[in-house]
From Swiss-Prot:
Annotated organism of origin: Cavia porcellus
Name by which UniProt lists this protein: Leukotriene C4 synthase
Segments on the Cytoplasmic face: 1-6, 70-73, 125-150
E.C. numbers: 4.4.1.20, 2.5.1.-
Role, per record: Catalyzes the conjugation of leukotriene A4 with reduced glutathione (GSH) to form leukotriene C4 with high specificity. Can also catalyze the transfer of a glutathionyl group from glutathione (GSH) to 13(S),14(S)-epoxy-docosahexaenoic acid to form maresin conjugate in tissue regeneration 1 (MCTR1), a bioactive lipid mediator that possess potent anti-inflammatory and proresolving actions.
Membrane topology term: Multi-pass membrane protein
């Protein structure tokens, strides 16, 4: 059992560490710009770091759910790879947003694509799980044919 989910567990732990890093950056920005809790407004430099962290936290549960469902029901390696891409693009998003609101956009779109791909993999995996064996085999043949033409 453990071997079947080791990649998913690793990506999950990396995601948790990334969330911790984002939180530490908010603490650092609070100190640098003298914004005491519970305030969430201050200089634009602080607000960008704060908003980047909050946005990443808001999407983290969606990421975890799609990562695990895609990994268990579709393919662990594919889900883990998409998960790593998602985490890397969220890190780039955070760094970009901390510098300027405009620099957040390209990584934001890239992370959205990775999340949509995880959702698609999770959906396909669950669909295949609930289909009868004959329909599942036909779906797999169709997917292989589509991948060859792509």
């Amino acid at each position: 059992m453990k071997d079947e989910v080791a990649l998913l567990a690793t990506v999950t732990l990396l995601g948790v560490l990334l969330q911790a890093y984002f939180s530490l950056q908010v603490i650092r920005a609070r100190r640098a710009h003298r914004v005491s809790p519970p305030l969430t407004t201050g200089p634009p430099e602080f607000e960008r770091v704060y908003r980047a962290q909050v946005n990443c936290s808001e999407y983290f549960p969606l990421f975890l759910a799609t990562l695990w469902v895609a990994g268990v029901y579709f393919h662990e390696g594919a889900a883990a790879l998409c998960g790593l891409v998602y985490l890397f693009t969220r890190l780039r998003y955070f760094w970009g947003y901390a510098r300027s609101a405009q620099l957040r956009l390209a990584p934001l779109y890239a992370s959205a694509r990775a999340l949509w791909l995880l959702l698609a993999l999770a959906t396909l995996g669950l669909l295949a799980h609930f289909l009868p064996a004959a329909a599942r085999a036909a779906l797999l043949r169709l997917l292989r044919a589509l991948l060859r033409t792509a």
